[in-house]
Amino acid sequence: MTRIALVTAIAAAGLDDDLDPLLDACTRAGLIAQVRAWDDPTVAWGRFDAVVLRSPWDYTQRLDEFLAWCAAVSARTRLVNPLPVVRWNTDKHYLADLQARGVAVVPTRFVEPDTEPLPALQAFLSEHADAAEFVVKPAVGAGSRDAQRYARSQEFAAANHLARLLDSDRSALLQPYLSSVDEHGETALMYFAGGY
């Protein structure tokens, strides 16, 4: 039987509501699935035929450690997604790659740690004069951690937020806020075996 590890984090134990139904589905499919935390040093990852990233949600605060763990696991067994994809997807700079390949993405300005925050924000607001609201968030982030929505009138609060991110040596991004998120939410697409 195929053994798979469904990866979470010690700090995320019990927070992934989809794990129980996924475990049931794996059992029905004839798989032996176990939930394991990526940051549990007692796990023998080589015992699994595949290690599937599910909810290692603290990776954003421990990125170097997480990527080193991914590299170690991928040297022992199959990591899903593959290591190059994980590395690429952990940093929202991938949006620029997608855009360069013709994929429509939310207009994004990346701001790097050596940049003055207020002029960068003012240039962004000038480029997006029709945006009533905008978002400041870290390039490496999950959920809404350290992300904030601002009205144009909150330029200085947004610049301070941006400065805090940059001062902690984190790249950030600025995007117009899309009201469709309020109305329709966000949709994640999953691509398997050539289809969505």
Which ranges hold each PLM region?
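Conserved N-proximal alpha/beta basic substrate-recognition cap immediately N-terminal to
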Residues: R3, I10-E116
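Structural motif
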Residues: A5, V52-R54, V135, L173
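Short, surface-exposed amphipathic charged segments that create phosphate/polyanion-binding patches used
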Residues: D49, Y94-D97, L121-E127, T187-A193
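Short acidic/polar capping segments at secondary-structure boundaries
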Residues: P84-V85, E112-E116, A139-G143, S153-E155, ...
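ATP-grasp fold ATP-binding core
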Residues: L98-Q99, L125-D146, D169-D182
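Glycine-enriched alpha-helix->loop->beta-strand junction motifs that scaffold or abut catalytic
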Residues: G102-V103, D130, G195-Y196
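Structured catalytic cores of enzymes that bind and process phosphorylated ligands/cofactors
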Residues: T108-F110, L121-F124, A131-F134, A151-Q154
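Phosphate-binding site of ATP-dependent enzymes
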Residues: R145, A151-Y196
